[in-house]
């Protein structure tokens, strides 16, 4: 099977620094392992070309490589460009036009299918009309971690290593960082706590607790993975739409601690975790640290599994969008 990818080709994992880049790189690797041939086409450039010209260029590229699908790994890509691009491609391309997003977009996105990381089926069980639209134009493929990067490492000391997630991007949103950092002062065992800030990956000073902002400054995936591979505990600090890093930490053997209502239920159920209150019970945490068990629980969440679910869709007939 041939697939046309909208976006940049990443040659090495060391080039990956963002969520979209992670999808682009890891999906490409998984597709290649499955025997899929990938061709790449540039993203739309507003002000440089018209939507009509871009559609023609994409269709020409798709025809030239006999593509069965056009896939944009960039998060909800076709909703970030003029709507007519996606709609024209859906109408004129015989194969699937697809994108990736956190959750269901019902039939609002100008694509044939949105592959979702989160399973939103439960949201529409009491609304048959919306449930039909959800099932027709969305498919849950789940989440994954690159097991070449995120895997169990043997510990060489008895230091409890804790990774505290970065503070919320939006400082006006609710964030548990300060309370969690203050809880570190109650630990009575040797430990090291690390976090992610605008200055990169840093060690937390328990004698000088402060919440340092993080505004999405890119950190190489290789560097971040090396940090998580050392962690016994990963602490969520704020509500997450996905919580992908939670899976990556669990792949490395970390026990996940989270305040209530910070992770989607289907995400949380897949990892060994504790829901914490304002006062963390460190005795219970330490008793539940089991790196081998934590890693074993999430081993099935691979990029190959996600690629396989997408390919299952691409070999079927795509649905009609009618006049949408």
Summary of predicted features, one role per range:
Residues 19, 277-322:
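A charged, aromatic-enriched C-terminal amphipathic alpha-helix characteristic of glycosyltransferases
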Residues 23, 146-149, 155-207, 211-221:
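Conserved catalytic-core segment of nucleotide-activated headgroup transferases in glycan assembly
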Residues 39-129:
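Extended catalytic core of nucleotide-activated donor transferases of GT-like folds
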Residues 103-104, 120-121, 135-151, 200:
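Short beta-strand->alpha-helix junction loop in the catalytic core
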Residues 225, 247-251, 265-266:
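Short alpha-helical segment that forms part of, or immediately flanks, the ligand-binding pocket
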Residues 226-241, 254:
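Acidic donor-binding loop of glycosyltransferase active sites
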Residues 255-259:
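Short hydrophobic beta-strand element within catalytic cores of glycosyltransferases
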Residues 260-274:
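Short acidic/histidine- and often glycine-rich active-site loop of Leloir-type glycosyltransferases
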